[in-house]
Amino acid sequence: MLSQIERNLTNPTVAVLWRLANALGVNLADLLSADAGGRPAGGIALVQPHAIPALKSPDGHCELKILGPIELAGRFEWYELTIQSGGVLASEPHEAGTQEHLSVLSGAMSVQAGAEERKLRHGETARYAADVPHAIRNGGKATATALLVVVHPA
């Protein structure tokens, strides 16, 4: 995985980054952002748009904004996913029992999980196993956005 990341062949999930950071003894919040957006005691933490970390696919057609706090990585992750026309976000299987929930906010996308594929339009949500090879595509002419939630097994 490290070799693939270094060669820009894959984008790691937050869970993978979290495990790597723990193995290396590095604070993931410091790695991804100077302002981790932690919750102050008794207050509301506001994370400015410039402080939200983002991952881009090697071809630049897909962007994942990491909306969830780093301390939940490996349990729950949520992202704002933007895919340009013709873009594909392909993923290898995550650990057994992992589920993804994709809610299309604008445009249209298709989801493939294993051998099954479904098309989604604005406002629709797909829930699917992510412990098999899976991909999210934008086959339309316009940019599409979605909320992607990854739930890891307990």
Model-based region annotation:
Residues A96-G114:
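Glycine- and acidic-residue-biased ligand/ion/polar-headgroup-sensing regions
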Residues G60-E63, R121-H122, A130-A154:
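Ligand-binding loop in jelly-roll beta-barrel domains
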Residues L72-F76, G87-H101:
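A short beta-loop-beta micro-motif enriched in histidine and acidic residues
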Residues N22-R75:
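A short, N-terminal "cap"/entry segment at the start of jelly-roll beta-barrel domains
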Residues M1-P12:
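Recognition helix of helix-turn-helix/homeodomain-like DNA-binding domains
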Residues L67, G114-A130:
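Short acidic-glycine-tyrosine-enriched beta hairpin
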Residues V14-L17:
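Long, hydrophobic alpha-helical segments
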